[in-house]
Amino acid sequence: MLAPAMGELYANLPQWLRELIPILVLLGVIALVVTRLPKVDVGHSAAFRSRRLLNWLPVGLTYAFLYMGRYNLTAFKNAVDMSNDAYGTIDMWGAVTYGVSFLLNGPLTDKLGGRKTILIAALGAGAMNVAMGILALRGWTEDKTLWFALLYAANMYFQSFGAVSIVKVNASWFHLRERGTFGGIFGVLISLGLYFAYDWSRKIAEGISPPWVFFIPPMILFALAVADFIWVRDTPADAGQKDFDPEDASSGDTGPPLGVLAVAKRMLTSPIILVIAAVEFFSGFLRNAIMKWYPVFAKATGIKDTFVPANWGMLLCCAGILGGMLAGVISDHVFGSRRGPVASLLYGGMLAGSGVVAVTLGGPLVGWVVVVMSLCIIGVHGMLSGTASMDFGGRRNVGVAVGIIDGFVYLGTAAQALTLKHVLPDGPAARDPHNWWTWPVALAPAALLGLLLATRVWNARASGKPAAAH
């Protein structure tokens, strides 16, 4: 009874208040989380912490707005009534390109450094968004699917530098014991990007015109590229600070750097890295099956103006922030910086949520259930892709480790795009929410397999030769 009452109350509010509420909620959640962040003292000076903030904030904001230049496709789809088949095809080829690109871009980031590759990501993705915007100015027809798929795939190639870059840069700036909290920060950045991508893009499409969802993100990305060039540095020493040993998998490794093939072999023969990669395959499947398809479900079934769909980006942002911080704090302070237990618990939430969605498709509760599921899956992604990759790859090999793990995330994304474009209802059949029963049925097996795999790394912990922090 509570959900319908809240929906009716929201519908009766004046427009200005409906616009203000999401912003206030978002600011409140961010303030709550920031003030509650645990302090892990590993001996960093105040000057070091200040310079580190100036380092990760620009690169983090760049990563967030890369999300806006990635998930804006959903807003464009809904604005121009693109078919599920065309949307799934474009999304699938973008995801495949993103996943496979890590085979090249992971080692390349280890070689070039995260500062250079975040610039490549921002400038390249910005240029491809401009190209998609120019194509969109000519109007959408289904025969443009191939061209959009090609441009979106090129966009996703440049996008793939983003995650590797942010983890590569921060691997040298964060001690192992600080990284659970950093995993929470990683979740915040992902979540802010989702807010921009879904809520801002929808408002841009409705308030200006659909092609502008591809023109606004490049403007922001190009400005942030300038900030990255000015402030971001790969290591503390490059920024005039003292380097330190983060006590990760690279600790004590002072020999010459391994070649790309040797590093890849080391990563691919690590049972822990392979299990984490497999878990993240299902994370990619579930994350995008929820985030991308719930707005499509809401529009098709006529509920797009109710509270959850109308504020989807804000709710994803809040869920992601809380999920990321909760996962990071529990990992560091309950499980001794082990990532597997938290991933297992969150996957359990995903499995339970799939069952609840199956029995609530026709009611207002389904939106809130998928918000909670988003909290769980963003928490897993930040914990494993953003944190475990640093732990087990080490700062010297983190590019390859992230490449393997995030590559699997986007292969999972491609699998969901290929699966859901065929099994979900389209056209008039999509108007009946009960015809969407295939949606939770597709989610449940992925959640179960991810849970079983996550339990395999319950006790996994990175090891290296300890050294004193500065």
Task: Please describe what each predicted stretch is.
Residues 151-190:
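Cytoplasmic helix-loop-helix junction between adjacent transmembrane helices
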Residues 64, 128, 143-161, 365-383, ...:
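Hydrophobic core of transmembrane alpha-helices in multi-pass small-molecule transporters
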Residues 42-49, 239-275:
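Juxtamembrane intracellular "pre-TM" segments in multi-pass secondary transporters
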Residues 9-18, 186-237:
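Helix-loop-helix hairpin linking two adjacent transmembrane segments in secondary transporters
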Residues 70-75, 270-325, 381, 413-420:
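Extracytoplasmic gate region of multi-pass secondary transporters
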Residues 337-387:
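C-terminal transmembrane helical hairpin of 12-TM major facilitator-type secondary transporters
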Residues 111-122, 332-347:
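Cytoplasmic membrane-interface "Motif A"-like loop-to-helix N-cap segments
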